[in-house]
Amino acid sequence: MKPLADYLVVDFSQFLSGPSASLRLADLGARVVKVEKPGTGVICRSLYTSDVVMNGESSVFHAINRNKESFTADLKKEEDANLVKKLIAKADVMIHNFRPGVMERLGLNFEEVIKINPSIVYAEISGYGTAGPWRDRPGQDLLLQSLTGLTWLSGNAADGPVPMGLSIVDMLAGANLVQGILACLLGRSTTNQGALVQVSMIESAYDFQFEAITTFYKDGGLLPQRTKVNNAHAYLGAPYGIYETQDGYLALAMGAIPVLGKLLGCEALEAYILVADAFDRRDEIKNVLAKHLEKGSTQHWLAILEPADIWCADVLTWDRLLKHEGFTSLDMLQDVAMKDGFQYKTTRCPIRIDGERLYSTIGSPALGQDNETILKELTEK
């Protein structure tokens, strides 16, 4: 049995941050009921990040809402609101990621919900916290990356700000929310008291940069300096980066420069004998290294570096990755199906418990597909 098999989560969240949290709780065995607007559902159903349409809706929605139920309710109507409150009364966890003030207007803020269910863990994600000048701004991932300094850590020195190609702040906030929820559920087991868990996307982005921000303050407030070429980390010296080869790319992490020079047959690198050179002269070193690595194939260099325990790797595209034994041996994919029979392939939960991988064959819910079942449960005496 999965560890959260007896837990009920009522999820009002939209987009990615909140749903990523409820997805992980579902992976761990919780029953997750999405509360959606009648007729249209959550906005994520029509949030297209590509031209891929899955069963008439967004691929994003289907990827992040597998193994959940859908219950439609108009929270502005008293009858529907009362039904939702009955559902909350049975729940262990409630999640939302509306802007500050929305749940207060609906009468579903923490102070009201704790009256309905004193033992509930009430979990919320905001963009910028509940106070401050940015409080009411839209909590969108690219905006958060831009406001928190993340965009100045990727790319080369002349590139300007470069955002990450994934909704990283959404995922970080969702992961932090799950940690808070699980901690409060553990605490509730001894106190039987509910709790309020609050996470903001902006604080999650700051926490993600704890290493860089700590260095910034200790370094006299100097801004991070990306290398001119092959940058992969603003605070690390050469050879750290990704380099083009004859037929692809090679990732190189840490390594003593003279040792690399000997192994690769590049005499020019052997001149950088001081440890400080790796950082102070990293642009020079990377230029020399880049020109040399273009002379051989990726596998040629890997065959030299890997036996010497140099930290390096091929740079795989998804099509190559999915065929590689390193990926297939993990059994990272699973096939899931919606109630109408629509099937799709997606990733599984990355957590193992007692050596067992966590799978679920249940796909994402059609809008309101579980209304009948849930209404029956709520009206049973």
Residue ranges and their predicted role:
Residues M1-Q193, Q225, A366, D370-K381:
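N-terminal helix-loop segment corresponding to the beta1-alpha1 unit
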Residues G39, Y128-G129, M201-Y206, D247-Y249, ...:
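Glycine-rich beta-alpha junction loops
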Residues F61, P224-Q225, V229-Y235, Y240-G241, ...:
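Short Gly/Pro-enriched turn/cap motifs at secondary-structure boundaries
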Residues P161-L172, G194-L196, T227-N231, A238-Y240, ...:
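A short glycine-threonine-serine/GTX helix/turn-capping micro-motif
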Residues G174-G194, D207-G221, K262-A268:
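Oxidoreductase and adenylate-handling cofactor-binding alpha/beta cores
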Residues H233-A308, C312:
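Aromatic-enriched alpha-helical interface/lid elements that frame and gate functional surfaces
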Residues E306-L330:
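Conserved PLP cofactor-binding pocket of PLP-dependent enzymes
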Residues M338-K381:
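Flexible, small-/acidic-enriched active-site or ligand-binding loops
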